[in-house]
Amino acid sequence: MAQHFSLGACDVVGFDLDHTLCRYNLPESARLIYNSFAQFLVKEKGYDEGLLTLTPEDWDFCCKGLALDLEDGTFIKLAADGTVLRASHGTKMMTPEALTEAFGKKEWRHCVSDKRCTSDKPGVSDIPCCSGKCYFYDNYFDLPGALLCARVVDSLTKQNRGQKTFDFWKDVVAGIQHNFKMSAFKENCGFFFPEIKRNLGKYVHRCPESVRKWLRQLKDAGKITMLITSSHSDYCKLLGSYILGEDFADLFDIVITNALKPGFFSHFPSQRPFYTLENDEEKDELPSLDKPGWYSQGNAAHLYELLKKMTSKPEPKVVYFGDSMHSDIFPAHHYTNWETVLILEELQGPEMEKPEEAEPLEKRGKYEAPMVKPLNTLSNKWGSYFIDSVSGRGRAEDSVVYTWSSKRISTYSTIAIPNIESIAELPLDYKFTRFSTNNSKMAGYYPLVHHTLGSQDTDSKIISTEK
Protein backbone atom coordinates (compact mmCIF):
# COMPACT_ATOMS: atom_id res chain seq x y z
CA MET A 1 0.00 0.00 0.00
CA ALA A 2 1.15 3.53 -0.77
CA GLN A 3 2.77 5.48 2.03
CA HIS A 4 0.48 8.46 1.57
CA PHE A 5 -3.27 9.00 1.37
CA SER A 6 -4.91 11.75 -0.66
CA LEU A 7 -8.54 12.73 -1.10
CA GLY A 8 -7.66 13.65 -4.64
CA ALA A 9 -7.13 9.96 -5.41
CA CYS A 10 -10.60 9.01 -4.12
CA ASP A 11 -13.66 8.74 -6.33
CA VAL A 12 -16.20 8.77 -3.51
CA VAL A 13 -16.18 10.62 -0.17
CA GLY A 14 -18.65 9.52 2.51
CA PHE A 15 -19.48 10.98 5.90
CA ASP A 16 -21.16 10.04 9.13
CA LEU A 17 -23.33 12.81 10.60
CA ASP A 18 -23.33 12.89 14.42
CA HIS A 19 -19.95 13.86 15.89
CA THR A 20 -18.42 13.87 12.40
CA LEU A 21 -20.00 16.53 10.18
CA CYS A 22 -22.17 17.63 13.09
CA ARG A 23 -20.10 18.59 16.12
CA TYR A 24 -21.86 18.75 19.47
CA ASN A 25 -21.21 21.03 22.44
CA LEU A 26 -19.90 18.10 24.47
CA PRO A 27 -20.54 19.32 28.04
CA GLU A 28 -24.15 20.18 27.20
CA SER A 29 -24.90 17.16 25.01
CA ALA A 30 -23.38 14.83 27.61
CA ARG A 31 -25.69 16.17 30.31
CA LEU A 32 -28.69 15.86 28.02
CA ILE A 33 -27.91 12.26 27.08
CA TYR A 34 -27.23 11.30 30.69
CA ASN A 35 -30.45 12.92 31.89
CA SER A 36 -32.48 11.31 29.09
CA PHE A 37 -31.51 7.84 30.25
CA ALA A 38 -31.48 8.60 33.98
CA GLN A 39 -35.01 10.04 33.84
CA PHE A 40 -36.22 6.88 32.12
CA LEU A 41 -34.57 4.54 34.62
CA VAL A 42 -35.92 6.46 37.61
CA LYS A 43 -39.41 7.30 36.36
CA GLU A 44 -40.17 4.21 34.28
CA LYS A 45 -38.10 1.48 35.93
CA GLY A 46 -37.98 2.57 39.55
CA TYR A 47 -34.25 3.13 39.97
CA ASP A 48 -32.80 5.28 42.77
CA GLU A 49 -33.57 9.00 42.39
CA GLY A 50 -29.96 9.72 43.33
CA LEU A 51 -29.08 8.93 39.71
CA LEU A 52 -30.62 12.29 38.75
CA THR A 53 -28.06 14.28 40.75
CA LEU A 54 -24.55 14.82 39.39
CA THR A 55 -21.53 16.89 40.41
CA PRO A 56 -18.98 18.26 37.91
CA GLU A 57 -16.40 15.88 39.41
CA ASP A 58 -18.53 12.86 38.47
CA TRP A 59 -17.77 13.43 34.79
CA ASP A 60 -14.10 12.56 35.28
CA PHE A 61 -15.21 8.92 35.16
CA CYS A 62 -15.92 9.25 31.43
CA CYS A 63 -13.14 8.01 29.15
CA LYS A 64 -13.53 6.59 25.67
CA GLY A 65 -12.35 3.02 25.22
CA LEU A 66 -13.79 1.56 28.43
CA ALA A 67 -15.49 -1.82 28.38
CA LEU A 68 -18.36 -2.74 30.71
CA ASP A 69 -18.63 -6.33 31.87
CA LEU A 70 -22.40 -6.78 31.68
CA GLU A 71 -22.32 -9.64 34.16
CA ASP A 72 -20.47 -8.16 37.13
CA GLY A 73 -20.60 -4.38 36.57
CA THR A 74 -16.84 -3.96 36.18
CA PHE A 75 -15.42 -1.29 33.87
CA ILE A 76 -12.15 -2.19 32.15
CA LYS A 77 -9.37 -0.29 30.37
CA LEU A 78 -7.54 -2.75 28.12
CA ALA A 79 -3.99 -2.88 26.83
CA ALA A 80 -3.38 -3.66 23.17
CA ASP A 81 -2.80 -7.33 24.04
CA GLY A 82 -6.13 -7.69 25.85
CA THR A 83 -4.74 -7.54 29.39
CA VAL A 84 -6.30 -5.23 31.98
CA LEU A 85 -4.63 -1.86 32.65
CA ARG A 86 -7.17 -0.32 35.02
CA ALA A 87 -10.58 -1.33 36.33
CA SER A 88 -13.42 -0.13 38.50
CA HIS A 89 -16.47 -1.72 40.07
CA GLY A 90 -19.11 0.83 39.29
CA THR A 91 -17.35 4.15 39.84
CA LYS A 92 -15.00 2.74 42.53
CA MET A 93 -11.52 2.33 41.06
CA MET A 94 -9.70 -0.90 41.91
CA THR A 95 -6.32 -0.67 43.63
CA PRO A 96 -3.23 -2.09 41.87
CA GLU A 97 -3.28 -4.98 44.35
CA ALA A 98 -6.94 -5.77 43.68
CA LEU A 99 -6.29 -5.47 39.95
CA THR A 100 -3.46 -8.02 40.09
CA GLU A 101 -5.52 -10.41 42.18
CA ALA A 102 -8.57 -10.19 39.92
CA PHE A 103 -6.94 -10.15 36.49
CA GLY A 104 -3.20 -10.87 36.74
CA LYS A 105 -1.43 -10.56 33.41
CA LYS A 106 -3.88 -12.70 31.48
CA GLU A 107 -6.20 -11.59 28.70
CA TRP A 108 -9.49 -10.28 30.03
CA ARG A 109 -12.05 -13.08 30.11
CA HIS A 110 -14.21 -11.48 27.42
CA CYS A 111 -11.29 -11.07 25.00
CA VAL A 112 -10.75 -13.68 22.33
CA SER A 113 -7.58 -13.84 20.22
CA ASP A 114 -9.28 -15.21 17.15
CA LYS A 115 -8.63 -14.42 13.49
CA ARG A 116 -12.35 -14.70 12.80
CA CYS A 117 -12.86 -11.60 14.95
CA THR A 118 -10.53 -9.45 12.92
CA SER A 119 -8.97 -10.38 9.62
CA ASP A 120 -6.63 -12.72 7.84
CA LYS A 121 -4.44 -9.75 6.97
CA PRO A 122 -0.91 -9.84 8.40
CA GLY A 123 -0.52 -7.92 11.65
CA VAL A 124 -4.26 -7.67 12.25
CA SER A 125 -5.14 -11.05 13.74
CA ASP A 126 -3.26 -10.34 16.97
CA ILE A 127 -5.81 -7.76 18.15
CA PRO A 128 -8.16 -9.43 20.64
CA CYS A 129 -11.86 -8.95 20.04
CA CYS A 130 -14.52 -9.07 22.72
CA SER A 131 -17.59 -11.20 23.31
CA GLY A 132 -21.20 -10.11 23.50
CA LYS A 133 -21.03 -10.18 27.29
CA CYS A 134 -19.47 -6.72 27.39
CA TYR A 135 -20.15 -3.30 25.93
CA PHE A 136 -17.54 -0.87 24.60
CA TYR A 137 -17.92 2.88 24.95
CA ASP A 138 -16.16 4.32 21.92
CA ASN A 139 -18.01 7.53 21.07
CA TYR A 140 -19.42 10.64 22.73
CA PHE A 141 -23.01 9.56 22.29
CA ASP A 142 -22.42 6.40 24.34
CA LEU A 143 -20.05 7.84 26.91
CA PRO A 144 -22.58 9.48 29.28
CA GLY A 145 -24.15 6.03 29.50
CA ALA A 146 -20.91 4.70 30.97
CA LEU A 147 -21.20 7.12 33.89
CA LEU A 148 -24.87 6.27 34.34
CA CYS A 149 -24.27 2.51 34.29
CA ALA A 150 -21.39 2.85 36.75
CA ARG A 151 -23.63 4.78 39.14
CA VAL A 152 -26.37 2.15 38.69
CA VAL A 153 -23.85 -0.50 39.76
CA ASP A 154 -22.94 1.63 42.80
CA SER A 155 -26.60 1.99 43.72
CA LEU A 156 -27.49 -1.68 43.28
CA THR A 157 -24.39 -2.80 45.16
CA LYS A 158 -25.33 -0.56 48.09
CA GLN A 159 -28.99 -1.56 48.08
CA ASN A 160 -28.29 -5.27 47.88
CA ARG A 161 -25.29 -5.38 50.21
CA GLY A 162 -22.57 -6.34 47.80
CA GLN A 163 -24.53 -7.71 44.84
CA LYS A 164 -22.18 -9.66 42.54
CA THR A 165 -24.17 -10.04 39.32
CA PHE A 166 -26.44 -7.57 37.57
CA ASP A 167 -29.36 -7.52 35.17
CA PHE A 168 -29.81 -3.79 34.56
CA TRP A 169 -28.65 -3.79 30.93
CA LYS A 170 -32.09 -4.71 29.63
CA ASP A 171 -33.43 -1.53 31.23
CA VAL A 172 -30.67 0.54 29.60
CA VAL A 173 -31.62 -0.93 26.21
CA ALA A 174 -35.27 -0.10 26.94
CA GLY A 175 -34.18 3.48 27.64
CA ILE A 176 -32.45 3.65 24.27
CA GLN A 177 -35.58 2.39 22.56
CA HIS A 178 -37.77 4.86 24.47
CA ASN A 179 -35.66 7.89 23.58
CA PHE A 180 -34.48 6.99 20.09
CA LYS A 181 -37.04 4.74 18.41
CA MET A 182 -37.80 5.71 14.83
CA SER A 183 -41.03 7.51 15.74
CA ALA A 184 -39.63 9.38 18.77
CA PHE A 185 -38.71 12.56 16.89
CA LYS A 186 -42.07 12.81 15.11
CA GLU A 187 -44.06 11.96 18.24
CA ASN A 188 -41.92 14.27 20.39
CA CYS A 189 -41.61 11.52 22.99
CA GLY A 190 -38.78 10.60 25.31
CA PHE A 191 -36.47 13.19 26.87
CA PHE A 192 -33.82 13.75 24.19
CA PHE A 193 -35.61 14.99 21.05
CA PRO A 194 -38.04 17.43 22.72
CA GLU A 195 -35.12 19.24 24.38
CA ILE A 196 -32.99 19.20 21.21
CA LYS A 197 -35.86 20.77 19.26
CA ARG A 198 -36.32 23.51 21.88
CA ASN A 199 -32.64 24.44 22.18
CA LEU A 200 -30.74 23.10 19.18
CA GLY A 201 -28.11 25.86 19.30
CA LYS A 202 -27.27 24.93 22.89
CA TYR A 203 -26.19 21.45 21.88
CA VAL A 204 -24.93 21.65 18.29
CA HIS A 205 -22.22 23.72 16.57
CA ARG A 206 -22.82 25.09 13.08
CA CYS A 207 -20.23 24.04 10.50
CA PRO A 208 -17.77 26.84 9.70
CA GLU A 209 -17.92 28.26 6.20
CA SER A 210 -14.63 26.52 5.39
CA VAL A 211 -16.34 23.13 5.74
CA ARG A 212 -19.29 24.14 3.56
CA LYS A 213 -16.90 25.40 0.87
CA TRP A 214 -14.85 22.21 1.14
CA LEU A 215 -17.92 20.01 0.59
CA ARG A 216 -18.77 22.03 -2.52
CA GLN A 217 -15.15 21.76 -3.64
CA LEU A 218 -15.36 17.97 -3.43
CA LYS A 219 -18.40 17.94 -5.72
CA ASP A 220 -16.85 20.48 -8.09
CA ALA A 221 -13.80 18.20 -8.34
CA GLY A 222 -16.05 15.39 -9.57
CA LYS A 223 -16.18 13.41 -6.34
CA ILE A 224 -19.35 11.55 -5.44
CA THR A 225 -20.34 12.65 -1.95
CA MET A 226 -22.39 10.57 0.49
CA LEU A 227 -23.97 11.03 3.90
CA ILE A 228 -24.46 7.72 5.72
CA THR A 229 -25.94 8.03 9.20
CA SER A 230 -27.81 5.83 11.64
CA SER A 231 -29.92 8.83 12.62
CA HIS A 232 -33.43 8.84 11.20
CA SER A 233 -34.33 11.13 8.31
CA ASP A 234 -36.30 13.68 10.35
CA TYR A 235 -33.46 14.22 12.84
CA CYS A 236 -30.94 14.28 9.97
CA LYS A 237 -32.93 17.08 8.31
CA LEU A 238 -33.01 19.08 11.53
CA LEU A 239 -29.25 18.78 12.06
CA GLY A 240 -28.27 19.17 8.41
CA SER A 241 -30.33 22.32 7.94
CA TYR A 242 -28.86 23.86 11.09
CA ILE A 243 -25.20 23.04 10.56
CA LEU A 244 -24.96 23.39 6.76
CA GLY A 245 -28.05 25.33 5.65
CA GLU A 246 -31.49 24.49 4.28
CA ASP A 247 -29.96 23.21 1.04
CA PHE A 248 -27.60 20.80 2.83
CA ALA A 249 -28.91 17.77 0.92
CA ASP A 250 -27.65 19.33 -2.33
CA LEU A 251 -24.10 18.86 -1.03
CA PHE A 252 -24.51 15.07 -1.23
CA ASP A 253 -25.25 12.84 -4.18
CA ILE A 254 -26.47 10.06 -1.88
CA VAL A 255 -28.04 10.35 1.58
CA ILE A 256 -28.69 7.20 3.62
CA THR A 257 -30.46 7.55 6.96
CA ASN A 258 -31.34 4.88 9.55
CA ALA A 259 -28.33 3.01 8.15
CA LEU A 260 -28.16 0.76 11.24
CA LYS A 261 -24.37 0.68 11.29
CA PRO A 262 -22.28 -1.43 11.67
CA GLY A 263 -24.74 -3.84 10.03
CA PHE A 264 -24.87 -1.57 6.98
CA PHE A 265 -21.31 -2.67 6.19
CA SER A 266 -21.43 -6.29 7.36
CA HIS A 267 -24.88 -7.60 6.43
CA PHE A 268 -25.82 -9.25 3.14
CA PRO A 269 -28.23 -7.33 0.88
CA SER A 270 -31.01 -9.82 1.64
CA GLN A 271 -30.65 -9.06 5.35
CA ARG A 272 -30.63 -5.29 5.02
CA PRO A 273 -32.39 -3.95 1.88
CA PHE A 274 -32.79 -0.28 1.02
CA TYR A 275 -36.14 1.46 1.44
CA THR A 276 -37.62 4.54 -0.15
CA LEU A 277 -38.85 7.33 2.11
CA GLU A 278 -42.10 9.27 2.07
CA ASN A 279 -42.66 11.98 4.69
CA ASP A 280 -39.80 10.48 6.69
CA GLU A 281 -41.45 7.05 6.80
CA GLU A 282 -40.02 3.96 5.12
CA LYS A 283 -42.11 2.75 2.19
CA ASP A 284 -41.01 0.47 -0.64
CA GLU A 285 -38.29 -2.17 -0.29
CA LEU A 286 -35.78 -1.95 -3.14
CA PRO A 287 -34.21 -5.04 -4.74
CA SER A 288 -31.19 -2.93 -5.75
CA LEU A 289 -30.00 0.66 -5.76
CA ASP A 290 -30.32 2.09 -9.24
CA LYS A 291 -29.83 5.84 -8.87
CA PRO A 292 -28.55 8.46 -6.42
CA GLY A 293 -31.01 9.94 -3.94
CA TRP A 294 -32.18 9.73 -0.32
CA TYR A 295 -32.78 6.24 1.10
CA SER A 296 -33.23 4.42 4.40
CA GLN A 297 -31.41 1.37 5.84
CA GLY A 298 -29.57 -0.59 3.12
CA ASN A 299 -26.20 -2.24 2.71
CA ALA A 300 -22.73 -1.40 1.44
CA ALA A 301 -22.78 -4.09 -1.26
CA HIS A 302 -25.71 -2.60 -3.19
CA LEU A 303 -24.34 0.89 -2.61
CA TYR A 304 -20.99 -0.08 -4.10
CA GLU A 305 -22.72 -1.45 -7.22
CA LEU A 306 -24.35 1.95 -7.68
CA LEU A 307 -20.99 3.68 -7.18
CA LYS A 308 -19.49 1.52 -9.92
CA LYS A 309 -22.21 2.67 -12.28
CA MET A 310 -21.90 6.34 -11.28
CA THR A 311 -18.11 6.41 -11.66
CA SER A 312 -17.91 4.04 -14.65
CA LYS A 313 -15.13 2.26 -12.76
CA PRO A 314 -14.93 -1.42 -11.78
CA GLU A 315 -13.38 -0.58 -8.40
CA PRO A 316 -14.09 3.02 -7.37
CA LYS A 317 -11.98 4.19 -4.44
CA VAL A 318 -14.07 5.18 -1.42
CA VAL A 319 -13.12 7.01 1.79
CA TYR A 320 -15.45 7.22 4.78
CA PHE A 321 -15.24 9.71 7.67
CA GLY A 322 -16.65 8.64 11.05
CA ASP A 323 -16.19 8.97 14.79
CA SER A 324 -17.02 5.45 16.01
CA MET A 325 -14.51 2.62 15.71
CA HIS A 326 -17.29 0.06 16.24
CA SER A 327 -19.90 1.50 13.89
CA ASP A 328 -17.83 3.37 11.28
CA ILE A 329 -14.13 2.72 11.05
CA PHE A 330 -13.67 -0.99 11.73
CA PRO A 331 -16.61 -2.20 9.58
CA ALA A 332 -15.87 0.16 6.68
CA HIS A 333 -12.25 -0.99 6.68
CA HIS A 334 -12.84 -4.67 7.36
CA TYR A 335 -15.94 -5.50 5.31
CA THR A 336 -15.66 -3.08 2.38
CA ASN A 337 -11.94 -2.22 2.30
CA TRP A 338 -12.73 1.49 2.15
CA GLU A 339 -10.23 4.09 3.27
CA THR A 340 -11.22 5.40 6.70
CA VAL A 341 -10.73 8.75 8.42
CA LEU A 342 -11.36 8.67 12.17
CA ILE A 343 -12.68 11.87 13.75
CA LEU A 344 -10.93 12.03 17.11
CA GLU A 345 -11.70 15.17 19.10
CA GLU A 346 -9.00 14.26 21.61
CA LEU A 347 -6.54 15.64 19.03
CA GLN A 348 -7.82 19.21 19.21
CA GLY A 349 -4.56 20.65 20.51
CA PRO A 350 -5.01 24.09 22.10
CA GLU A 351 -8.63 23.32 23.02
CA MET A 352 -7.45 20.27 24.92
CA GLU A 353 -7.21 21.28 28.57
CA LYS A 354 -5.93 18.87 31.19
CA PRO A 355 -8.18 18.71 34.27
CA GLU A 356 -5.32 19.80 36.54
CA GLU A 357 -4.83 22.94 34.42
CA ALA A 358 -8.45 24.05 34.72
CA GLU A 359 -9.17 27.20 36.73
CA PRO A 360 -9.90 26.34 40.39
CA LEU A 361 -13.52 26.74 41.49
CA GLU A 362 -12.60 29.31 44.12
CA LYS A 363 -11.18 31.63 41.44
CA ARG A 364 -14.37 31.63 39.38
CA GLY A 365 -17.08 34.24 39.69
CA LYS A 366 -19.49 33.82 42.58
CA TYR A 367 -22.46 33.06 40.37
CA GLU A 368 -20.66 31.16 37.63
CA ALA A 369 -21.91 27.58 37.32
CA PRO A 370 -19.24 24.91 37.76
CA MET A 371 -17.92 23.61 34.46
CA VAL A 372 -18.52 20.05 33.33
CA LYS A 373 -15.32 18.42 32.09
CA PRO A 374 -15.53 18.05 28.29
CA LEU A 375 -15.60 14.39 27.32
CA ASN A 376 -12.55 14.77 25.05
CA THR A 377 -10.22 15.80 27.89
CA LEU A 378 -7.96 13.61 29.98
CA SER A 379 -9.53 11.57 32.79
CA ASN A 380 -7.72 11.56 36.13
CA LYS A 381 -9.29 8.20 36.97
CA TRP A 382 -8.45 6.41 33.74
CA GLY A 383 -5.50 8.32 32.29
CA SER A 384 -4.81 8.62 28.58
CA TYR A 385 -7.10 7.07 25.98
CA PHE A 386 -3.98 6.16 24.00
CA ILE A 387 -1.38 4.80 26.45
CA ASP A 388 -0.83 3.75 30.05
CA SER A 389 2.06 2.72 32.27
CA VAL A 390 2.53 -0.82 33.53
CA SER A 391 4.86 -2.00 36.28
CA GLY A 392 7.10 -5.00 35.78
CA ARG A 393 6.36 -7.05 32.67
CA GLY A 394 9.86 -8.48 32.91
CA ARG A 395 11.56 -5.08 32.98
CA ALA A 396 13.35 -3.28 35.78
CA GLU A 397 11.27 -0.13 35.28
CA ASP A 398 7.77 0.83 34.29
CA SER A 399 6.93 0.48 30.62
CA VAL A 400 4.42 2.49 28.64
CA VAL A 401 1.96 0.38 26.68
CA TYR A 402 -0.54 1.20 23.98
CA THR A 403 -4.18 0.74 24.84
CA TRP A 404 -6.51 -1.61 22.99
CA SER A 405 -8.27 1.44 21.54
CA SER A 406 -4.99 3.00 20.39
CA LYS A 407 -3.98 -0.14 18.53
CA ARG A 408 -7.35 -0.35 16.81
CA ILE A 409 -6.98 3.27 15.69
CA SER A 410 -3.62 2.62 14.02
CA THR A 411 -4.78 -0.69 12.53
CA TYR A 412 -8.15 0.22 11.04
CA SER A 413 -7.89 3.97 10.37
CA THR A 414 -6.12 5.39 7.33
CA ILE A 415 -5.60 8.64 9.26
CA ALA A 416 -7.10 10.31 12.35
CA ILE A 417 -8.01 14.00 12.58
CA PRO A 418 -9.63 16.14 15.32
CA ASN A 419 -12.43 17.42 13.07
CA ILE A 420 -13.19 18.09 9.42
CA GLU A 421 -12.39 21.77 9.84
CA SER A 422 -8.74 20.83 10.41
CA ILE A 423 -8.36 19.66 6.79
CA ALA A 424 -10.97 21.80 5.02
CA GLU A 425 -8.47 24.39 3.78
CA LEU A 426 -5.90 21.89 2.53
CA PRO A 427 -5.68 21.16 -1.20
CA LEU A 428 -7.51 17.97 -2.16
CA ASP A 429 -4.24 16.45 -3.36
CA TYR A 430 -2.57 16.97 0.04
CA LYS A 431 -0.65 13.83 0.95
CA PHE A 432 -1.37 12.52 4.46
CA THR A 433 0.95 9.94 6.01
CA ARG A 434 -0.90 6.70 6.65
CA PHE A 435 -0.87 4.79 9.92
CA SER A 436 0.29 1.78 7.93
CA THR A 437 3.56 3.54 7.01
CA ASN A 438 6.37 1.43 8.49
CA ASN A 439 3.77 -0.10 10.86
CA SER A 440 3.82 3.18 12.79
CA LYS A 441 1.42 3.65 15.70
CA MET A 442 1.59 7.44 15.36
CA ALA A 443 2.20 8.34 11.70
CA GLY A 444 -1.48 8.81 10.81
CA TYR A 445 -2.41 11.45 13.37
CA TYR A 446 -3.00 14.85 11.73
CA PRO A 447 -2.10 17.62 12.38
CA LEU A 448 -0.61 16.62 15.75
CA VAL A 449 0.01 13.48 17.72
CA HIS A 450 -1.91 13.54 21.02
CA HIS A 451 0.24 15.07 23.77
CA THR A 452 0.27 11.85 25.82
CA LEU A 453 1.87 10.11 22.84
CA GLY A 454 4.02 12.92 21.50
CA SER A 455 5.54 13.78 24.87
CA GLN A 456 6.93 10.31 25.50
CA ASP A 457 10.68 10.28 26.16
CA THR A 458 11.53 6.99 24.52
CA ASP A 459 15.05 7.07 25.94
CA SER A 460 13.71 6.72 29.49
CA LYS A 461 10.47 4.86 28.88
CA ILE A 462 9.76 1.95 26.62
CA ILE A 463 6.68 1.98 24.43
CA SER A 464 5.55 -1.63 24.47
CA THR A 465 2.78 -3.58 22.77
CA GLU A 466 4.06 -6.94 23.90
CA LYS A 467 2.36 -9.29 26.32
UniProtKB/Swiss-Prot annotation:
UniProt key word Hydrolase: yes
Annotated signal sequence is none
- InterPro entries reported for this sequence: HAD-like_sf (IPR036412), HAD-SF_hydro_IG_5-nucl (IPR008380), HAD_sf (IPR023214)
Q: What positions constitute the catalytic site?
A: 16 (nucleophile), 18 (proton donor)
Q: Which residues carry this modification: N6-acetyllysine?
A: 181
> Is-annotated flag, keyword Acetylation?
yes
Q: EC class of this enzyme?
A: hydrolase
List the keywords (alphabetical).
Acetylation, Hydrolase, Magnesium, Metal-binding
Where Mg(2+) binds, per the record, is at 16, 18, 323
Single Gene Ontology MF annotation:
metal ion binding
Which family is this sequence assigned to? Belongs to the 5'(3')-deoxyribonucleotidase family.
| Protein name per Swiss-Prot or TrEMBL | 5'-nucleotidase domain-containing protein 1
The organism is Mus musculus (Mouse)
Which classification does the entry list for the species? Eukaryota, Metazoa, Chordata, Craniata, Vertebrata
